[in-house]
Amino acid sequence: MKNIRNFSIIAHIDHGKSTLSDRLIQTCGGLSDREMEAQVLDSMDLERERGITIKAQSVTLDYKAKDGETYQLNFIDTPGHVDFSYEVSRSLAACEGALLVVDAGQGVEAQTLANCYTAIEMNLEVVPVLNKIDLPAADPERVAEEIEDIVGIDAMEAVRCSAKTGLGIEEVLEEIVHKIPAPEGDPNAPLQALIIDSWFDNYLGVVSLVRVKNGMLKKGDKIKVMSTGQAYNVDRLGIFTPKQVDRTELTTGEVGWVVCAIKDILGAPVGDTLTHQHNPATAALPGFKKVKPQVYAGLFPVSSDDYEAFRDALGKLSLNDASLFYEPETSSALGFGFRCGFLGLLHMEIIQERLEREYDLDLITTAPTVVYEVELTNGEVVYVDSPSKLPPLNNIGDIREPIAECNMLVPQEYLGNVITLCVEKRGVQTNMVYHGNQIALTYDIPMGEVVLDFFDRLKSTSRGYASLDYSFKRFQSANMVRVDIMINGDRVDALALIVHKDNAVYRGRELVEKMKELIPRQQFDIAIQAAIGNQVIARSTVKQLRKNVLAKCYGGDVSRKKKLLQKQKEGKKRMKQLGNVEVPQEAFLAILHVGKD
């Protein structure tokens, strides 16, 4: 056990976590050179295309150190994007140490900080590593000072390496062996194993990634899941060397996978504890804090026949992704679907793309909203995650919107642009600290403004140099109203949005103009209106298509022409009473882009 090291890698997006993990695997001979490919651990197609890590993955490597001993390194790769920070905290719970990878050219960024603080709170040993020192722009001295200044850990001794060329990888491995403590735990105590992650395999059922804290887990053991009390037989277990390798047992301190033929998707929840059925542990291990979704959106299948398949797909995805929340919802415009909760817009895009790719579904998404706290006139408090659930105006005493605390690291020359952006988003500055050329800004910004397009705008105003980390802080009173979109006098529930009163007229007018371009012309006029309650704030009309009924009258009497025109007019009138307007898919997506350009 003293030769086991459990660690994960934390870093900002694009600072080279996945490339470094490739080199570690190659150096320790986890895969032969023939099987090696770039970003081995990013196994999802989506991860490769976007170049980001979404799911945490684990690998067990054997490393023969310079002191002659062979160490077992259990290494868990973590995502760097702010939307996936819950994946990071899960990975860290299974480790004793973390490598803090910082790009020697770019220096410390906001996510590096956030993830690093998470690690320090969990009492992990943080080992700084300066990556990409082969780049001409690398300045390891300055970055080492930055780490000490901003993060506050000793970095003068930090290992310098280049994951791309393989320089300094041996030194990184030696640091891991010497600095990160061995796992603690009692091999003879009753079994306690923490479920770090679960996913669904069509042949094996639920596969769980576990970290054994105490005791031993053997093939053929009878185990039970502590939260549900269900008992299972261990059919197979083993480790990843990235390839799945079977073993007969997992001992204290090891990380590996377990298959117990669990058919039910909710059979092995993430963060739960496994123990023996006959000799159970007295208490469960502390799990992870439940993540609350920050953004809600309705997802509806384009054809209603796909509803069942859609429900099953969501079930399988939610097993793999603990932070996905969903409940059934019906809409008069779109039929049956689900209201889903996500951690952020990137998370929402990825889930939608995974549903469309892996499960072959066609989906319509409604505009994302955040959760509002609404106090009714009778003193009752309700939480509203969709505009259609907002109570009537005369029943509402107070609407409180969620405020996010945003920590940004901004280079000095872009400070003005970023402050302008924050003010435009109704932000309030709470702190500002200078660290050399970088400035740490803290703003309280309404969550609704942050989740829509704040991240993209922040990147574009600062040419990609500013970085952001945000977390929910509190609810605060605000003058929010619901803007309804009406087409020919009928409210379309899927197009409603909750906005601040100051922006309502502007957003309403913009949305109405956009809808005018997207709704195809019919044989009659279509009136598109935006309204708050009964007050219409914007309107535009899609003009009718009109057939020239006088084409065949050459000369002749004017009363003949009048008769034909009158007949056409009556026909149009009747058509308008009966006619239905098809709202195309693009119109629902238009809401997302309102206020961007």
From Swiss-Prot:
Q: Where is the tr-type G domain?
A: 2-184
Question: Which Enzyme Commission numbers does its entry carry?
Answer: 3.6.5.n1
Could you name the domain of life of the organism this protein comes from?
Bacteria
Which Gene3D superfamilies does the record cross-reference, listed alphabetically? 3.30.70.240, Elongation factor 4, C-terminal domain (3.30.70.2570), Elongation Factor G (Translational Gtpase), domain 3 (3.30.70.870), P-loop containing nucleotide triphosphate hydrolases (3.40.50.300), Translation factors (2.40.30.10)
User: What is the membrane topology listed in the Swiss-Prot or TrEMBL record?
Assistant: Peripheral membrane protein
Does the record bear Ligase in its keywords?
A: no
Listed binding positions for GTP are 14-19, 131-134
Q: What GO molecular function annotations does the UniProt record carry, in alphabetical order?
A: GTP binding; GTPase activity; guanosine tetraphosphate binding; ribosome binding; translation elongation factor activity
Per the record, the similarity remark reads: Belongs to the TRAFAC class translation factor GTPase superfamily. Classic translation factor GTPase family. LepA subfamily.
Protein name per its UniProtKB record? Elongation factor 4
